[in-house]
C-alpha cells in the first residue's frame, strides 16, 4: 500500500458537484496518489461516493486502472432487517457485491 491515500468520505457524495470530485481525483493522481479509499456508507447519501467514484473511474481513469488501488469497507448499517448491518457473512458478501456494482469494478 502507498504511504498516502485519498479518502473519499464526505467529498464524493451526491451533495458535491461531480466536477469538483473529478478535479480532486485528477489532481491527486497527477501528484502521485494511486490509492483511493471508499466505504459502502460514504456519501451522503450512503453508497453515493462509490457510485460517483465509479463514474469518474469509467470516464477518466480507465487507461490507468492498473496503476490504481481501490479499497472499500463494509460493516455499517445500509438497510433495514437482520442482514442489513455489521458483520454477518451474508451482510459482508452482499455489501461487497453492491460495492462492486456501484464502483463498476
Identify the meaning behind each predicted range:
Residues 1-69:
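N-terminal binding-site loop/beta-alpha segment at the start of enzyme catalytic domains
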